């Protein structure tokens, strides 16, 4: 399980934290060498103080100097309360990150005009991924640290404190060393994860190191011990400057600005693809909000319009192939599973392999830690249940309808002219089946006429109690006249329901529209195929579209205007842009033999599925000249005398066909009609024989209108649409978002199973573990409380965003007071408490989020790419905003905002040196012998993780030594 998968190095680090904290709290009392360097400022003291100060919210716990036992009790209460507050912050931060995921997933529709004049509509994300990661995403993951710094300054009469800035620096150290060490270690042996957007990583890493270097400059170089207004404001304004630089790197706007580019509508997902090269000869125009933007105009490079480069194009194609493989393998792997289980497995696998944001991993980690379960599996199960339930509702809704529907089973019927009668089925569905229902029917002429082509029929059908199906018959009149296919109509009308039966058994019927009515179809069309002709053979249509996943394609060859005699029709496939021989389809040829009265046959062609996302290839299917089976011989005779002939059991043009008996010489009967040419030359025909010959020729089978069928092979529509849905990132916003307060309260009180270790896709619901129950009951108060936060559906996530950040600020104020009171209770300095305990508490959710991202994501960006950007944002927002407010306040009162440079400047310098080492090692790991920033051979993983953990321990150790004046700072 995720919650028990911390590495041994990280566990060892946690133990060392406690040892270091206890060591320095005792050294504080054992050592006598202390100095007082500041004036009333605690940062200048070399020892902690047992005397606590009033917090922003919490009062002082009196008396100030309790006994040793009371100190232990108080420290325990403060520590437990602080941990509980950290749990609360994690849960409300989960809601906060959900709102951010929804906000950054917003899309806008644009229209692409192609050079040929065609237009297509597609959607693009409003938020650039890099911009959202550095603004809302970073704010979401670092909100407690940022708000703690601001609240501490504003809550203590705009004076500088140690807790906020030290928490920011300590959190940065924890993120840079411990989180990256964990991510390096948890990747399976032999696997690697590389940073995909290396340019963005370089920019954010440089800004991260610069941010802490800048802190040292304003504290110790520019104006030692004083933060001026311009320094505070410039620190804050570095934040948007950093975002712009990262966006420029992501969009390649510096060097690439001077390279001509062209844009085309990409085949994948309808996205816009960027190409670099020569000036294009034609323009692709793009409409956004009604404005047309030319393809090579610089302003086209808007971050809101997510232009995809070829690299992304290839990645999407690979992802689609992977999705197609999953869809095909699931049914083969689990043929015994029911539809709900298969849907759940497919949804889970697809969601698991999607590219995810930092916000998603943070939400997933928090919910797994607090017993809320795996949101991907829960969403997949919910979707499966909805799909199955909708199917059941659609099939059962008619059965539960209170009104009986009366309708024909099908809207069209076909029959041959010699069939005698045609049967039509009437269905009764829904309503009270104990009633007796009457419905009238009546035939109506179409191209067929009553009396000459069919028998006029009308009457009433009675559905007795319990009966749901009735059959009516209409007589068909056969003649020997060649005719086109004809049709007539049969109408249903006048539905009546029997309310009661009289004593003599006669049913009394009345119109009750609330009990029964006509359904659809209430009119049936009957087509009569003429059987006096050998037939006209044709395809249904000249062009047909088939999916490449169809497997065996079946094409109908129709026999119209007659069905008399046995006829052979040859057929064959012809290559077009699609290739035969098993490449796109298998070559097929042969003959169709239509038996007497048979009106349709099918040709089967195997289509090869090569899993192309978009496909448009053609081949042709052609039928040849039809021939009667008997006319394949030299003579075709119509006989009405036996003589020296024997009956064959076959018919030609309505007459029995005879065959001459060998070794018997009889004169040719006078009634023989010859069709062979040799007899035409020797024997003139009478007018009667000529008429019979003409009729016989008219009855020969011929080809119809569509003798050549164009077959267009396309990608499977279901396959294409499914893949599009699976790979679309915005689905994750639906997974983490909520639609109603009811849904939120149900989630709050429900305990769910955490992560599976084996992930064996068993399809069986996993029961919550003991850990899940314990964490659920520990956090249920926070879950229910924060269920009152508006759902992410409202205001596109902004309502949830605003309320959540206010809640985080309130809890952070409590955490600041508890941490400060905990420190003074055990005489631990605020700076040490912040660097060790507070930084650790605020970073635990990020630790688990990075661990999940490192193991599940294809790249290292989601796990460690956000660390550097978050560190820079912490300084520019957390310290920049707080110090700007304080500096302006003091300047307005004619005072200076004093900040002791000692401990903070030393910590910043130490962190900066270690950060250079960290980034250098990560870049070295990209060499071929290791292959990426994360993972790699076991030895390399272990050495890297141990080095980073050692850097963090050294940072804690030296910062604590400096705080207690055992080594000299700045």
From Swiss-Prot:
Q: What is known of its domains?
A: The cytoplasmic Calx-beta domains bind the regulatory Ca(2+). The first Calx-beta domain can bind up to four Ca(2+) ions. The second domain can bind another two Ca(2+) ions that are essential for calcium-regulated ion exchange.
Signal peptide interval: 1-32
Keyword terms = Antiport, Calcium, Calcium transport, Calmodulin-binding, Cell membrane, Glycoprotein, Ion transport, Membrane, Metal-binding, Phosphoprotein, Repeat, Signal, Sodium, Sodium transport, Transmembrane, Transmembrane helix, Transport
Annotated spans, Putative calmodulin-binding region:
251-270
Q: What family does the database annotate? A: Belongs to the Ca(2+):cation antiporter (CaCA) (TC 2.A.19) family. SLC8 subfamily.
**So what does this one do?**
Mediates the exchange of one Ca(2+) ion against three to four Na(+) ions across the cell membrane, and thereby contributes to the regulation of cytoplasmic Ca(2+) levels and Ca(2+)-dependent cellular processes. Contributes to Ca(2+) transport during excitation-contraction coupling in muscle. In a first phase, voltage-gated channels mediate the rapid increase of cytoplasmic Ca(2+) levels due to release of Ca(2+) stores from the endoplasmic reticulum. SLC8A1 mediates the export of Ca(2+) from the cell during the next phase, so that cytoplasmic Ca(2+) levels rapidly return to baseline.
Question: Where is Ca(2+) 1 annotated to bind?
Answer: 417, 453, 479, 483
UniProt-annotated glycosylation sites, renumbered to this chain: 41, 157
Determine if Transmembrane helix is one of this entry's keywords: yes
Output the Gene3D superfamilies linked to this UniProt entry: 2.60.40.2030, NCX, central ion-binding region
One annotated GO molecular function is: calcium:sodium antiporter activity
Localization, UniProt: Cell membrane
Q: What is the name of this protein?
A: Sodium/calcium exchanger 1
Q: Name the source's superkingdom.
A: Eukaryota
Carrying Phosphoserine, the residues are: 282, 389
**Where, in this chain's numbering, is Ca(2+) 6 bound?**
584, 610-612
Where is it chiefly localized? membrane
Record text on activity regulation: Activated by micromolar levels of Ca(2+).
């Amino acid at each position: 399980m995720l919650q028990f998968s911390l590495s041994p190095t990280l566990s060892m680090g946690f133990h060392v934290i406690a040892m270091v904290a206890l060591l320095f709290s005792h050294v504080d009392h054992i050592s006598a060498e202390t100095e007082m360097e500041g004036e009333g400022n605690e940062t200048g003291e070399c020892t902690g103080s047992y005397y606590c100060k009033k917090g922003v919210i919490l009062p002082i716990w009196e008396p100030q100097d309790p006994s040793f036992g009371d100190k232990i009790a108080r420290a325990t209460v403060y520590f437990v309360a602080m941990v509980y507050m950290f749990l609360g912050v994690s849960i409300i931060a989960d809601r906060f990150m959900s709102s951010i995921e929804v906000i950054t997933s917003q899309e806008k529709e644009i229209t692409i005009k192609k050079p040929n004049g065609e237009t297509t509509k597609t959607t693009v994300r409003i938020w650039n991924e890099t911009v959202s990661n550095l603004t809302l995403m970073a704010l979401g993951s670092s909100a407690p640290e940022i708000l703690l710094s601001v609240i501490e300054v504003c809550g203590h009469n705009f004076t500088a404190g140690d807790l906020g800035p030290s928490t920011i620096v300590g959190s940065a150290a924890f993120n840079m060393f411990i989180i990256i060490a964990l991510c390096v270690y948890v990747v399976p042996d032999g696997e690697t994860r590389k940073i995909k957007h290396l340019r963005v990583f370089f920019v954010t890493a440089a800004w991260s190191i610069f941010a802490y270097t800048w802190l040292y400059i304003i504290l110790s170089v520019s104006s030692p011990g004083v933060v001026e207004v311009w320094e505070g404001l410039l620190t804050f304004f570095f934040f948007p400057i950093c975002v712009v630089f990262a966006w420029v790197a992501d969009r390649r706007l510096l060097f690439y600005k001077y390279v001509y580019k062209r844009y085309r509508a990409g085949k994948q997902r309808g996205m816009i693809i960027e190409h670099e090269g020569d000036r294009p000869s034609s323009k692709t125009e793009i409409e956004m909000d009604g404005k047309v933007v030319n393809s090579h105009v610089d302003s086209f490079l808007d971050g809101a319009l997510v232009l995809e480069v070829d690299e992304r194009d290839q990645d999407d194609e690979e992802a689609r192939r992977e999705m197609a493989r999953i869809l095909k393998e699931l049914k083969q792997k689990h043929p015994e599973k029911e539809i709900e289980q298969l849907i759940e497995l497919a949804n889970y696998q697809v969601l698991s392999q999607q590219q995810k944001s930092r916000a998603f991993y943070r939400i997933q980690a928090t919910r797994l830690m607090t017993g809320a379960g795996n949101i991907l599996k829960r969403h997949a199960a919910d979707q499966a249940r909805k799909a199955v339930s909708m199917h059941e509702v659609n099939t059962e809704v008619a059965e539960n309808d209170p009104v009986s529907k009366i309708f024909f089973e099908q809207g069209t019927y076909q029959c041959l002219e010699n069939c005698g009668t045609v049967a039509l089925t009437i269905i009764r569905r829904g309503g009270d089946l104990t009633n007796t229902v009457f419905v009238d029917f009546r035939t109506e002429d179409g191209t067929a006429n009553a009396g000459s082509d069919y028998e006029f029929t009308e009457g009433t059908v009675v559905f007795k109690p319990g009966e749901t199906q009735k059959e009516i018959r209409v007589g068909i009149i056969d003649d020997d006249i060649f005719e086109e296919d004809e049709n007539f109509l049969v109408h249903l009308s006048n539905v009546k329901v029997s309310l009661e039966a009289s004593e003599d058994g006669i049913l009394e019927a009345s119109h009750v529209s609330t009990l029964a009515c006509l359904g659809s179809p209430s009119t049936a069309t009957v087509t009569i195929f003429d059987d006096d002709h050998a037939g006209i053979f044709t395809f249904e249509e000249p062009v047909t579209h088939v999916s490449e996943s169809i497997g065996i394609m079946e094409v109908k060859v129709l026999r119209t205007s007659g069905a008399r005699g046995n006829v052979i029709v040859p057929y064959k496939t012809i290559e077009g842009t699609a290739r035969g021989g098993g490449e796109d389809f298998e070559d097929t040829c042969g003959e169709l033999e239509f038996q007497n009265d048979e009106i349709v046959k099918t040709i089967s062609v195997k289509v090869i599925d090569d899993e192309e996302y978009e496909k448009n290839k053609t081949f042709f299917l052609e039928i040849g000249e039809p021939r009667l089976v008997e006319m394949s011989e030299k003579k075709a005779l119509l006989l009405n005398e036996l003589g020296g002939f024997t009956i064959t059991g076959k018919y030609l043009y309505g007459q029995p066909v005879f065959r001459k008996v060998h070794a018997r010489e009889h004169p040719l009967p006078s009634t023989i009609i010859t069709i062979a040419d040799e007899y035409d030359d020797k024997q003139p025909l009478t007018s009667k024989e000529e008429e019979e010959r003409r009729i016989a020729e008219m009855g020969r089978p011929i080809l119809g209108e569509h003798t050549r069928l164009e077959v267009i092979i396309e990608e499977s529509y279901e396959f294409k649409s499914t893949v599009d849905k699976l790979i679309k990132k915005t689905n994750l916003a639906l997974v983490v978002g909520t639609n109603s307060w009811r849904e939120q309260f149900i989630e709050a009180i429900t305990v769910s199973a955490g992560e599976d270790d084996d992930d064996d896709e068993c399809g069986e619901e996993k029961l919550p573990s003991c850990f899940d129950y314990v964490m659920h009951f520990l956090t249920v108060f926070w879950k229910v409380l924060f269920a009152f936060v508006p759902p992410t559906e409202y205001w596109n996530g902004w309502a949830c965003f605003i309320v959540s950040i206010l809640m985080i600020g309130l809890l952070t104020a409590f955490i600041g007071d508890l941490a400060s009171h905990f420190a003074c209770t055990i005489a631990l300095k605020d700076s040490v408490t912040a660097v060790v305990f507070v930084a650790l508490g605020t970073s635990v959710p990020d630790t688990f989020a990075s661990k999940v991202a490192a193991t599940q994501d294809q790249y290292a960006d989601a796990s460690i790419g956000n660390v550097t950007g978050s560190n820079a944002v912490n300084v520019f927002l957390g310290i920049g905003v707080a110090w700007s407010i304080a500096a302006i306040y003091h300047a307005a009162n004619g005072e200076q905002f004093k900040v002791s440079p000692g401990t903070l400047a030393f910590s910043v310098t130490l962190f900066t040196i270690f950060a250079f080492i960290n980034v250098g090692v990560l870049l070295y790991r990209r060499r071929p012998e290791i292959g990426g920033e994360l993972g790699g051979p076991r030895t390399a993983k272990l050495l890297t993780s141990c080095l980073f953990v050692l850097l963090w321990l050294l940072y804690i150790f030296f910062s604590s030594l400096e705080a207690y004046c055992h080594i000299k700072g700045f």
